[in-house]
């Protein structure tokens, strides 16, 4: 009589649905997954140790390269941890700018997620719709920092510069006709706040388009409903955070439960799911984008009415004004000291957790009073989610694997560090 054995399959690390360098060793019984063993570490770059050998203010750029889809949200937790060590006051305007860009980053992350998830499940159109909208937000990144991705815009004590009064303009190129450039530039004639007023209105329409494409789509529901189900109790036991936890029906969001910056002054809801499956996680992220859009609008209205400083006036932490530096020896010394050796913090340890688009992103710093951390540890939300891969995949078909991996929304820049 023939002997039947389970089949072992290597999924990744170069599979297009692996979302980075994920390697899964799957044990299959026919087309059913019996066991899944995730292997991580293929993108390890030693970020924590690198930051321990540099002054605090020279490691902000490393944060952008952790979860390289949610750049400013990584910076946010890091600079807040430094501010907590220094007991540094941040100008109110800078707090609103940070929150506004954190919510823009959340939208950037979720749009890329729904685009990639759509491609994984065979819905190509949503990818094109989502990337069209992301360009507008990348223009905002570029306007404040000069970079479209790795901005390094947040600073201990505030942000690098105030919002621009003129948005970057599109030019006629080989790929952009003069007529198209003129149309793209229509909402970009004023300040960034004017541009964002246009954006929050247009973005609601864009989300409605994606909703129409996917939410009630029969094929989309067949691929996501009752797939990768996790109960609320089990999600808490597994250490889930963010949309993975809220998709299981747990209303836990650090912006509400442990508010930081100015979130306690803003109005927004926490969307939660009911069944804890892939479809609920999709619905939660779609609803979160609408809430982020409301938060951006509230920040725009406040910033328009309240001009002011955007960086601390403590020149031991924040660089002095350039014209002052060129005319005053004291400011020149502050500038030289800041960019050569940085600043020393008080001895102690701090932990700051923020509501990152993927979950709780935390930064732990232990300081011995020097100008660099004695120990820096980062909590990546994706690590706990990857750890549950065996439980999520077991009992499902091999074809469901891309759907489950996709709704976890993992990026290996922060998992492997």
From Swiss-Prot:
Coiled-coil regions in this chain?
none
Instruction: List the Gene3D superfamilies hit by this protein, alphabetically.
Output: Cytochrome-c3 Hydrogenase, chain B
Gene Ontology, cellular component aspect = plasma membrane
Keyword annotations: Cell inner membrane, Cell membrane, Membrane, NAD, Quinone, Translocase, Transport, Ubiquinone
Please name the InterPro entries in this protein's record.
NADH_Q_OxRdtase_suD (IPR001135), NADH_UbQ_OxRdtase_49kDa_CS (IPR014029), NDH1_su_D/H (IPR022885), NiFe-Hase_large (IPR029014)
Indicate where this protein is primarily found: membrane
Enzyme Commission code: 7.1.1.-
Q: Signal peptide position in this chain? A: none
Q: Its quaternary structure?
A: NDH-1 is composed of 14 different subunits. Subunits NuoB, C, D, E, F, and G constitute the peripheral sector of the complex.
Query: Entry's HAMAP family?
Result: NDH1_NuoD
Family label: Belongs to the complex I 49 kDa subunit family.
Record's protein name: NADH-quinone oxidoreductase subunit D
Organism, per UniProt? Francisella tularensis subsp. tularensis (strain SCHU S4 / Schu 4)
Gene that this sequence comes from: nuoD
């Amino acid at each position: 009589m023939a002997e039947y054995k389970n089949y072992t399959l290597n999924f990744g690390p170069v599979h297009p649905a692996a979302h980075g360098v994920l390697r899964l060793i799957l044990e299959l019984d026919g087309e059913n997954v019996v066991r899944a063993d995730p292997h991580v570490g293929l993108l390890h770059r030693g970020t924590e140790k690198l930051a321990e050998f540099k002054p605090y203010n020279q490691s902000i750029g490393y944060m952008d390269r952790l979860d390289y889809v949610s750049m400013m949200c990584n910076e946010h937790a890091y600079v807040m941890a430094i501010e907590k060590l220094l007991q540094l006051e941040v100008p109110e305007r800078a707090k609103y700018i940070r929150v506004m860009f954190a919510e823009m980053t959340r939208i950037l992350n979720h749009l890329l997620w729904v685009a990639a998830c759509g491609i994984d499940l065979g819905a190509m159109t949503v990818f094109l719709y989502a990337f069209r909208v992301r360009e507008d937000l990348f223009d905002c990144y570029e306007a404040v920092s000069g970079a479209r991705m790795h901005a390094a815009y947040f600073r201990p004590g505030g942000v690098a510069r105030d919002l621009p009064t003129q948005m970057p303009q599109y030019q006629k190129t080989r790929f952009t006709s003069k007529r198209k450039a003129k149309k793209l530039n229509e909402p970009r004639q004023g300040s960034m706040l004017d541009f964002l007023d246009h954006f929050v209105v247009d973005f609601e329409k864009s989300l409605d388009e994606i909703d129409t494409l996917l939410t009630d789509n029969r094929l989309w529901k067949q691929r996501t409903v009752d797939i990768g189900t996790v109960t609320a109790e089990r999600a808490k036991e597994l250490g889930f955070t963010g949309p993975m936890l809220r998709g299981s029906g747990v209303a836990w969001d650090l912006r509400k439960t442990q508010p930081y910056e100015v979130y306690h002054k803003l109005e927004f809801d926490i969307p939660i799911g009911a069944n804890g499956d892939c479809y609920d996680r999709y619905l939660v992220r779609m609803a979160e984008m609408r809430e982020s859009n409301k938060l951006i609008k509230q920040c725009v209205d406040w910033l328009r009415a309240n001009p002011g400083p955007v960086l601390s006036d403590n020149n031991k932490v924040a660089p002095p004004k350039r014209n002052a530096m060129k005319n005053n020896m004291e400011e020149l010394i502050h500038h030289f000291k800041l960019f050569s050796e940085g600043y020393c913090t008080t001895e102690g340890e701090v932990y700051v957790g923020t509501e990152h688009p993927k979950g709780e992103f935390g930064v732990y710093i232990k300081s011995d009073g020097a100008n660099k951390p004695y120990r820096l540890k980062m909590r990546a939300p994706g690590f706990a989610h990857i750890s549950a891969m065996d439980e999520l995949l077991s009992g499902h078909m091999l074809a469901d694997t891309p759907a489950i991996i996709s709704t976890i929304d993992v990026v290996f820049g922060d998992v492997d560090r």
